[in-house]
């Protein structure tokens, strides 16, 4: 849990975060290969925190409370873990799921653990003129307010998708390492200040 407390209490590193804002990690998606075939029906019957409805979805959905996460476990032995708030927590959760599967009698291993997506968010605390931003950054932006209230900004370097809302709230998704989230935010921050709405 130590990881989560860091952002609020420690001074922000001005070299890594010149804006003074550190995006908060909201969700980590990771994958791991348990490297053995699994009987999903048997798992669902024996594990109390599992649900399996093969007509709806071809995986067992399992949840644990600490770290609060959800796993999708496939018959091939592949597993997806979502919901953790840090990379370490995601790995810890994935290990816990692997251990549950082992305890049910399957020779589960822990191969090729990989972070697939990091979702972060932050608030620049000022409103943004999305029309102006979309117009001047047309190559990267799509903004259709009648379909979705946010501007979708597809950054090339790092390859991150940002959802930018008029309120100044930002969601960043697509990172494989948290530094990409931070870099993407620092890249967009000067653009956001440029399109700051003047308060009436």
UniProtKB/Swiss-Prot annotation:
One of its GO terms (cellular component) is nucleus. Its main location: nucleus. It is found in: Nucleus. Belongs to the TBP family. It comes from Mesembryanthemum crystallinum (Common ice plant). Gene3D superfamilies: TATA-Binding Protein. Belongs to the TFIID complex together with the TBP-associated factors (TAFs). Binds DNA as monomer. GO terms for biological process: DNA-templated transcription initiation. General transcription factor that functions at the core of the DNA-binding multiprotein factor TFIID. Binding of TFIID to the TATA box is the initial transcriptional step of the pre-initiation complex (PIC), playing a role in the activation of eukaryotic genes transcribed by RNA polymerase II. CDD domains: TBP_eukaryotes. PANTHER family: TATA-BOX BINDING PROTEIN (PTHR10126). One of its GO terms (molecular function) is DNA binding. This is TATA-box-binding protein. Transmembrane segments: none annotated. SUPFAM superfamilies: TATA-box binding protein-like. It holds the Pfam family TBP. InterPro entries: TBP (IPR000814), TBP_CS (IPR030491), TBP_dom_sf (IPR012295), TBP_eukaryotic (IPR033710). Keywords: DNA-binding, Nucleus, Repeat, Transcription. Sequence repeats lie at residues 25-101, 115-192. Disulfide bonds: none annotated.
